[in-house]
Amino acid sequence: MTPDLLEAGAVKRQQYQAKVEASNSSGGRAAAFGRVLTPGLPDFAHGVALYLDEVTVSFDGFKALNSLSLTINLGELRCIIGPNGAGKTTMMDVITGKTRPDKGSVTYGQNIDLLRLRENEIAGIGIGRKFQKPTVFEQLTVFENLELAQQADRSPRASLWSRLSGAQLDQIAEILTLIHLLGAAQIQAGLLSHGQKQWLEIGMLLMQSPTLLLLDEPVAGMTDEETERTAELFLSLEGKHSLVVVEHDMAFVDQLTQGCKQVTVLHEGSVLAEGLLSEVQANERVVEVYLGR
Ligand SMILES: Nc1ncnc2c1ncn2[C@@H]1O[C@H](COP(=O)(O)OP(=O)(O)OP(=O)(O)O)[C@@H](O)[C@H]1O
Ligand SMILES: [Mg+2]
């Protein structure tokens, strides 16, 4: 732990609590990182992190998801591809409680019915979500963003009186290293590049040690180098977390799957194909609806 990290850890919470409130990020953001009491602990004994069974979502009669079934195993890195409008983001909306399906079930582990939980409860039992646009607190430093994401209790009282423990500082340092921002810990998040902001947001999600991470087009707008580093980051997370990565960038998907992982192709709200990237790329129906556009 470097001295300036320690110093940053001692920053009075009330100083940046005010900044958080003035920050340009959405009000629900801090809440989404918050831990909440939940009805029970997820049971992962069977190695399944998430199970969607025949999930249907209709918008004015249009089926954005059409009897979608999908299983994500514990520690698995699963790439999901599909043309615009295939239902990829809607699927994440359903898993995180933002959208309620008309039909079907969504089970976390083998026992938690996610359809019965609210968005903040779902975030609190280990499901983190990264939206396409980075949503970090621009006026806070990188360190402060991670510190805030780490706090279980964000009430003003807790913010005023709590001090970071050695273990908490170690966790922040570990995540800073992982997301390539150790040297930028004291920089205001608003000054980071687009790619660095994306990494910071991923780091903020990791502070909560999520079991399942949902990442919607995480490398959109990144440089080639940033994209490659992001793939390395995700590969290093594989096994420790389940990752569901929605992406259009096939070179990135190729790097993530390393020629040996299953890719899921969504089309019109259902699974069109599943297999190695090379297999789905050679699948005529996939070529027709997606790759051949
Ligand atoms: N709130 C909504 N109201 C009405 N229609 C919606 C709503 N959300 C999504 N849709 C429609 O549902 C379909 C699936 O959208 P979704 O955003 O899930 O697709 P996607 O696979 O994420 O596409 P993209 O690759 O462009 O991000 C689209 O036709 C979209 O217009
Ligand atoms: Mg989308």
Residues covered by each model-derived region:
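ABC ATPase NBD Q-loop/coupling interface
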Residues: 105-125, 162
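The feature captures the beta-strand-to-loop junction immediately N-terminal to the Walker
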Residues: 81-83
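Conserved ABC ATPase "signature" region
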Residues: 34, 40, 159-184, 211, ...
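Helix-to-loop junction immediately C-terminal to a conserved catalytic motif
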Residues: 96
